[in-house]
């Protein structure tokens, strides 16, 4: 679930913020594009130098969030979620579960008939087969 939420949020961020339509430019117009780019760069430098730090704070900023799946383990004291949940239940509960499993061997609720098995080749694979 964590991976799907992360991948969905990453996809939404890519589609909403980073979507820029691209167009092919003929080779003859490359000189014009370079001239326009130089003009744009010079205008942006002038605009940045004229703006004070106070006016920059008023603008909206983009926040990029990068997450690592190993980070969740570090946040939960190095334990995955299911182990953290078992640890929160307490050590007594974990021990009683082991005792219950050991007690089930003495009185099984489902009878299991064990037979001597032999290996028979079926096709290219050895499968268990029983003597009659």
Swiss-Prot record:
Pfam families: Pro-MCH. Disulfide bonds join 120-129. InterPro entries: Prepro-melanin_conc_hormone (IPR005456). Keywords: Cleavage on pair of basic residues, Disulfide bond, Hormone, Neuropeptide, Signal. GO terms for cellular component: synapse. Residues 1-24 form the signal peptide. GO terms for biological process: chemical synaptic transmission; neuropeptide signaling pathway. GO terms for molecular function: melanin-concentrating hormone activity; type 1 melanin-concentrating hormone receptor binding. The keyword Cell membrane does not apply. Pituitary gland. Produced in neurons of lateral basal hypothalamus which project both to the brain and to the neural lobe of the pituitary gland from where MCH is released. Belongs to the melanin-concentrating hormone family. Plays a role in skin pigmentation by antagonizing the action of melanotropin alpha. Induces melanin concentration within the melanophores. May participate in the control of the hypothalamo-pituitary adrenal gland axis by inhibiting the release of ACTH. This is Pro-MCH 1. It comes from Oncorhynchus tshawytscha (Chinook salmon).
